Amino acid sequence: MIIYEDAVIDYLDDLVYELYKKEYFGFLESAYNFADNIIDFIENSIDTFTSKKTPESLQHFGSKYIFYKSNQRTTWYIFFENFENKYLITNIINSHCEEAKYL
């Protein structure tokens, strides 16, 4: 079971509109597909992809993380908590964020 904190869902929704508004994608549907690819990666990989322990300075994001490389310039870091087969997605940042330099 995978659960997303409300803030993560809000972030992904905002991301779609920001990518479209800044013309990274010419169509809103393309921006939605981009966000869907991140979600698909989480849904299909979180239980098989080797997770890493989050550095102490970023523990407020979540105790573990996995990463998804969406293209040559951008890597997405997905933070979470888990117990057995239950996962709580607590935060998502990308390699362009200041905090990513600590990963």
Q: What kind of feature is each model-predicted range?
A:
Residues 68-103:
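Enriched for short, Lys/Arg-rich terminal
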Residues 1-65:
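Basic, Lys/Arg-enriched alpha-helical interface segments
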